[in-house]
Amino acid sequence: MSAFVITTEQVWLDKYKYDDAEKQYYENLSMGSASNKPHNSPQSAASALSNSGDGSELAARVANLEQENQSLHKVVKDLQSAISKLESRLSTLEKSSKSQKPAAASQPAIEVAARVQKVQVTPAAKEENGTGEDDDDDDDIDLFGSDNEEEDAEAARIREERLKQYAEKKSKKPGVIAKSSILLDVKPWDDETDMAKLEECVRTVQMDGLVWGSSKLVPVGYGIKKLQIQCVVEDDKVGTDILEEEITKFEDYVQSVDIAAFNKI
């Protein structure tokens, strides 16, 4: 009896229950960690995008960006080709300009050489057409010096005559005369002043460079009228102060003289 009790106590009869419980625990633990782990695979990302409305919008934007990228690549290629064409054109123009510069520079040199040759040939031709004198006499006598001196003297005389004629013509030409148009207000003493006599007295003032013009009577007030008269004067010959002094000398008729308007002509 005692032996049976000992054997039964050493056997764990409920061990399978604990094993099942432990297995279930670890299975639940592993399933929970797998569900919390993010899906990083391309298939899961594609399925997530296809299953959501935002994913379709993002896909459309990506497609548009790809199209824009392709169009930009095309534009860049066109620009590169245009730049290459311009560079080739510039190189061609530089080569052509370099080839033309020596030719253009050589043309003045050719002209100078032709002139020098002409100058050298002309005395030789004149010597060949000479009177046949000896070489020693030709060395002592200047055949062309006298002619050149006569030509220089003739040219100087003609130039002096032309300058003299120009100076005379310029001296005879009248210069610009500065003139002014003046409107004078001549005021009488009272309404009993004879305005016709007053105007007659004013017009008796005569000076070199003074020309009287039209006139009229302008009412002032209380039956009094003033004489408004126009005149043209040369600025260098007639001054306004002198003109006013000459008019105010007729003190029996003239009270004062004022300048109503002054204009340069």
UniProtKB/Swiss-Prot annotation:
Residues 31-54 have a biased composition (Polar residues). Disulfide bonds: none annotated. Keywords: Elongation factor, Protein biosynthesis. It comes from the Eukaryota. Signal peptide: none annotated. InterPro entries: eEF-1beta-like_sf (IPR036219), EF-1_beta_acid_region_euk (IPR018940), EF1B_bsu/dsu (IPR049720), EF1B_bsu/dsu_GNE (IPR014038), Transl_elong_EF1B/ribsomal_bS6 (IPR014717), Transl_elong_EF1B_B/D_CS (IPR001326). One of its GO terms (molecular function) is translation elongation factor activity. Pfam families: EF-1_beta_acid (PF10587), EF1_GNE (PF00736). PANTHER family: EF-HAND AND COILED-COIL DOMAIN-CONTAINING FAMILY MEMBER, ELONGATION FACTOR 1-DELTA. EF-1 is composed of 4 subunits: alpha, beta, delta, and gamma. EF-1-beta and EF-1-delta stimulate the exchange of GDP bound to EF-1-alpha to GTP. Belongs to the EF-1-beta/EF-1-delta family. This is Elongation factor 1-delta.
